[in-house]
Amino acid sequence: MSDINATRLPVWIGYSPCVGDDCIALLTRGEGLC
């Protein structure tokens, strides 16, 4: 993980009420989009 991803991680957790596999999937998709 880069510093950018580490910084975005808490943002994703706060943005998504469901913390778990769904968030991991969103993070994976986000990295794919970037």
Curated annotation (Swiss-Prot):
Belongs to the MSDIN fungal toxin family. InterPro entries: Amanitin/phalloidin. Residues 1-10, 18-34 form a propeptide. Processed by the macrocyclase-peptidase enzyme POPB to yield a toxic cyclic heptapeptide. POPB first removes 10 residues from the N-terminus. Conformational trapping of the remaining peptide forces the enzyme to release this intermediate rather than proceed to macrocyclization. The enzyme rebinds the remaining peptide in a different conformation and catalyzes macrocyclization of the N-terminal 7 residues. This is MSDIN-like toxin proprotein 4. GO terms for molecular function: toxin activity. There is a cross-link at V11-P17 (Cyclopeptide (Val-Pro)).
